Amino acid sequence: MTIFQDKVKALRAHHEELLSRKNKPVEWGNGIYEKYKNPILTAEHTPLEWRYDFDEKSNPYLMQRIMMNATLNSGAIKWNGKYLLVVRVEGADRKSFFAVAESPNGVDNFRFWDEPITMPEDVVPATNIYDMRLTAHEDGYIYGVFCAERHDDAQPGDLSAATATAAIARTKDLVNWERLPDLKTMSQQRNVVLHPEFVDGKYAFYTRPQDGFIDTGSGGGIGWALVDDITHAEIKEEKIINARHYHTIQEVKNGEGPHPIKTDKGWLHLAHGVRGCASGLRYVLYMYMTSLEDPTKVIAEPGGYLLVPEGPEYIGDVMNVVFANGWIADEDGKVFIYYASSDTRMHVATSTIDRLVDYCMNTPKDDYRTQFSVEKIKALVAKNKQTLSK
């Protein structure tokens, strides 16, 4: 065996050790969910064949010819008994693409399929695509709604100027994708989610209207809109169902994460909220619930965040960020929340539908003033004194 072959053998052994590493819950949690000790996907989890040329003649130094930078913001679905993520993989060239990774148990042993997804182009090709939300719709298709980014040609002198539109594709097998025309909207959109059921015979979208590529501007929060024809989807009217508020976790902007989970108490929603701080923008996750009879009516919204970056999760390409656009609810009620930290790596947290409903229904809401927050704490202290004195 040559030195080159020895290096390849060692490389494959190291990679297999990473892929097969068992994951365990963090010992102490908050009772709402359990985080896990290890990230479930990193750039190093991507297949070696995507990165290395294993021909000794053309790559005698065994260099990475195509480097990967991050695995983040992944859609999720249970498919043929496996837990599948449609991962946003970002290369060293800053271009993102989609690739499927699957796990037998949802918390470890995630392995990518052999090749990335070949996503057909829209009429106007996109420079970058990312952050797919997966929805198994009652019409029989699995839809992927994702952001398509293009340069803003109205600002030719600004190489950072961009536009964001909601791209739509659908599939029956997660391999072959049919690209539909981008969603037509009255403003830029980069956080659009398809509701899993027809509403009044129409397709329903959660939206996030915004004035610019980054800034929401006059966009008031998470919106709701109905569309007649998914193959030529156009939003002509939308209403805000979950608004931004001053001095809250969603002061700067907010956006729907994955599609909501249907429960007998209402629709469970996972969203991200953004506020400004001295170090930049802080992204956290929060929850709310809407009515089964009227999905635009919020029936519960706990105050504050559900999940934030902790420890090593703070560190990465974009610091102090958690983002989720995928979760899976098992038949037994267990929920897998897939989230990215600092735009760098993927994690999982697990809970149950019962716990998440309890959290939403029984956690105090934000009343937007310090005085009311203190009153709630004092009320809980008094209740505990009475309970513990018995």
Question: How should these model regions be labeled?
Answer:
Residues 1-73, 77-127, 136-193, 197-252, ...:
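Beta-rich carbohydrate-recognition and catalytic domains
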Residues 328-333:
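Well-ordered alpha/beta subsegment
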